[in-house]
Amino acid sequence: MSGSKQGSEKASITSLIDSEEQGDEATSVSTQNQSPKTQITQTENVEVQNSDLKVTENKPKNTEMKPTDPNTNASTTENTPITTSNAQVSEKSEKTVPAWMREPEEAQNRYDRYVPRVDNRRRGEPRVAEVRQDPRYAKYLRQDQEERRIRRPDDEYEGDHKRRRPEMVTQFDDRRQGTRKNHPGQAGQSESEENGDEQQGDDEEETPGNEEPVEAQPYSRLATSVQSTQHYHTFQSHIANKENKDINSIVRSHYNQRTIQSKMQGSRTKSPIYKLRNFNNAVKYMLLGNHVRKNPNPGSPTVILDMCCGKGGDLNKAEFVGADQYVGIDISDASVKEAFHRYRRNKARFIPRDGGRAGQRDSRKYNFEACFATGDCFQQSIPEILEPNFPGIVNGLFPVDCVSIQFSMHYSFESEERVRTMLNNVSKSLRPGGTFVGTIPSSDFIRDKIVNKDFLPGTNNKFGNELYSVTFDRTPPSDGIFRPPFGNKYDYFLKDAVDNVPEYVVPFEVFRSMCEEVGLTLRYKKNFIEIFNQEIPKYFHKLNRNLVDGMKRADGKYGAEGAEKEAVSFYLGFAFEKLG
């Protein structure tokens, strides 16, 4: 490194990635007037020599923390007074259950309770009094659902519930005052780094087709994950009788099996898509880092709702953006269980305030409270999923600052009804000015492949490479525009991650138009390569060193290359804002 006698100045990164104009051309790091060492963070020094980046890291001193008693019956929300077990809920008298949670005993499906009752009164018999619904959760109903909603007498809902509500919800109100400051900018390395960009997924026998949605469950009594083996085994799912199962059963079975097998696969660094996963994770850090907005009200916490949280791969990102509360929901019960255990293993023990100064966040730990539930956000309302085990949570923590749906929203495009339920949950959960951030397959990328007839040899309905493939169940339209926009299925394969699971095309303009109908306006949309190219100079020194090193190309530069580049180009990132 050439020394500078005129003083030390900060190193600047002028190019770390390959732009679209340069194609696969290698990128470089340039420096100007630098001293031998430039301090980037409190625990990291960076040296720049001959446009090559070299990082030396000084480990901080370990913080003493009290060991957790393994015999303690931990709850899903560590140190959080919002947990309630299924047994406790079932022991409550029927009067304590909110009316919107009730279901008819003989209901054939989850929507029967919204069908108007047949009037079997005898002539002259007085009609049962109908009253207004609980106004706290009415906003989660679409207008057509509200018109058909069963109404019940006041005393059935308001009696005991009103008496117990203050002590339940006050706990959440108190938590809203407990925000923390001084969030460090660097993404920390938790005990278990993210395991990829997909939600993961249980045994085939436990997920028969056409079952009802899985109820929310607490996970304090479930076993922890087993240790991985030394050798790596590529993932393969085994879903019997797949052609006769609905999309929910297939997705749940796939990601349940993915969760179980991932514990025995071996070191994730040996995965054939290790670099691709790191690239996708880096893009998610950039999206959330740019678009999670703090609550403008003084003293209010930053709350994130992850509507398809998988195994908790985005918990590190919640810490990265300085979240105070995190709510994770997923259709796979095995994934939710794993997410809870990941959070519990890496949860920080809060540093007490000293002399009126707020304690620094430990970026290697989760300095936020979290709760997890199993449910289908594309068919159930958020209160239906959360309130059975966390009474008062919707009124206490909502509306939230950010709703995140990563690599999973395309499953909702099976039907218009599922999309509208999903968007209704998003819009009603967000505060004005809050953001909806997500990643989906790019309909523009799919259309270009179809129009250019860029199919695999011998096929007219399949494209991809050795890492990924997209196979339509029928020949796609020659112009690449799908009509109608819902239910256009294809099987997606990603080596060591997704094993030919049915997905659906998301025509982005249709999606954008439906978002506008619920008060969400588009603020950002770019494909993954564009996001990485634009944001990596800003985030290079903020991201965890292992994550950055995991994106190193064969030529020593950073970014996606070869088959990985095409695979990540399949996706785009977006951000919508909730209008006030």
From Swiss-Prot:
Pfam families: mRNA_G-N7_MeTrfase. Residues 54-67, 102-154 have a biased composition (Basic and acidic residues). Residues 191-214 have a biased composition (Acidic residues). Belongs to the class I-like SAM-binding methyltransferase superfamily. mRNA cap 0 methyltransferase family. Residues 1-222 are annotated as: Disordered. The keyword Nucleus applies. It is an enzyme of class 2 (transferase). One of its GO terms (molecular function) is mRNA 5'-cap (guanine-N7-)-methyltransferase activity. GO terms for cellular component: nucleus. Keywords: Methyltransferase, mRNA capping, mRNA processing, Nucleus, RNA-binding, S-adenosyl-L-methionine, Transferase. It catalyses: a 5'-end (5'-triphosphoguanosine)-ribonucleoside in mRNA + S-adenosyl-L-methionine = a 5'-end (N(7)-methyl 5'-triphosphoguanosine)-ribonucleoside in mRNA + S-adenosyl-L-homocysteine. Transmembrane segments: none annotated. Residues 1-17, 25-53, 69-90 have a biased composition (Polar residues). The gene is ABD1. CDD domains: AdoMet_MTases. This is mRNA cap guanine-N(7) methyltransferase. Its EC number is 2.1.1.56. The record marks 311, 317, 342, 410, 503, 571 as: mRNA cap binding. Responsible for methylating the 5'-cap structure of mRNAs. It comes from Meyerozyma guilliermondii (strain ATCC 6260 / CBS 566 / DSM 6381 / JCM 1539 / NBRC 10279 / NRRL Y-324) (Yeast). MRNA binds at residues 280-281. The keyword Methyltransferase applies. Residues 271-579 form the mRNA cap 0 methyltransferase domain. S-adenosyl-L-methionine binds at residues 284, 308, 330, 376, 406, 411.
